[in-house]
């Protein structure tokens, strides 16, 4: 019974959750339909055009900067799933390997896609044959030297024996002819035999020393040859790499990383070697990209999907879901076109330069913090512009309204009715300055200076994050990278372009799995900016103040007779044709003396 009750409660709770989710989705879809029906999207055509052009130029120049900055660094590839490469034959980096050079006197073919196994086997057999021939030659040379040394020693030993026999004969003759006293003075034959034995020992020691020196010299020569061969192999490699021994890396050029298949990328560890980094003037590309970003921000473009969604969270009524999605679509479209063109010019290197390996947390934190700060600055600038435009939408600082003076003279004194800068609006002396040919109020000068300060601060912050920390600050880069990879593998791989073959290729489970792996590996570059922008929008909402005063209105001549309910309407800036004179004067008073009624926002 308890189990049945528990299952019934679980089933009922799941149904309630599903109903709430379906209800929320239906309401959201209705809101989107209302937004599309109410808003005329044609008036946003110039905004969408600026989004496309700005995203295209920004991604293009920043991609060129990243490509040039990374091309001056040597990349190191390590095979992580192989213990001893020499025991299981040398491994070739997978991919399309096209080259015309010779490495260690080994000839290679240009196309390895067909008969790959036969080509690799022939390469390895040729290499092992050369090693075997070299070892046999060295052994034969050592044996020849040993034979020569032994023959020389044997000849010398025979000559010594002949000398010894001759010497013995001479001694016998001398013994027969000389006296007994002279025999004592002659040398003992035992001493002669001892001398011969010492001579033989010295000859054997010299022989062993010569052999040892010969072997050591040959070992040193072999080691030097191996080192020279490794150095030549590292320097002359263009498209293909033989793996080095354990704990050693194979250096390759950055273009070779593009030849690694996506399914085999987990088998390799891509590292950077900044020791060989050379000076270059590629920093100008980052400067131009950041300058373009600031210029299009000044024109009203966003050029960042994360910032667009932050505006949607800040003002969901103005930037609805449909409009925000349309903005982001044009941003992605411009970025993808720029990345494909950049890949045609410089190669698809950034597919792997932007792919994080074993530093996911570090990449996520860099993207999160940098995007949070940039979005905070952009939202602060947006709120400042919005507040200034609302306060000065009637442009009364340049043109004085005489009718308003007559309407407000019955309620307020001239001395108390002052503007934001605390000078009398009704003073006749102040009106003389409007008679000049060109007059700009101080608040407009202040607005322009603050605007320039915001833009410069955004420019240098963006330049710092891109140039120093090498962060993208934009999920559009990762999307452009993914679609550029698809372009290279699908569109450019085959000579004949067929649309139906592309759709069929996406039905492959292995390709879908590869794309999911690529997406997960580059996930910090996607989630970090979105999290940073959302956190910035939430942070600013904590300091947001209510700019509208809501009061209850009793049914008067403002409303028609059929409206019998009490309603809450905003009193400020409520332009209605049925308002009475008191409400008009009250609204005008609050509009021109907003500092007495409203607190200024923090940002």
Curated annotation (Swiss-Prot):
Parts of the chain that traverse the membrane: 40-70, 282-299, 321-346, 360-393, 442-471, 509-542
InterPro entries according to UniProt: Aquaporin-like (IPR023271), Aquaporin_transptr (IPR034294), MIP (IPR000425)
Catalytic activity: H2O(in) = H2O(out); glycerol(in) = glycerol(out)
Membrane topology: Multi-pass membrane protein
Knockout or disruption consequences: Dramatic reduction in development of mature sporozoites in the mosquito vector with no impact on any of the preceding stages.
UniProt superkingdom: Eukaryota
Sequence segments annotated as region (Disordered): 135-200
Keywords: Membrane, Transmembrane, Transmembrane helix
Main function: Required for sporozoite development in the mosquito vector.
Free-text comment on this protein's domains from its UniProt entry: Aquaporins contain two tandem repeats each containing three membrane-spanning domains and a pore-forming loop. One of the two canonical Asn-Pro-Ala (NPA) motifs in the pore region, which are highly conserved in aquaporin water channels, is changed to Asn-Pro-Met (NPM).
Name of the featured protein: Aquaporin-2
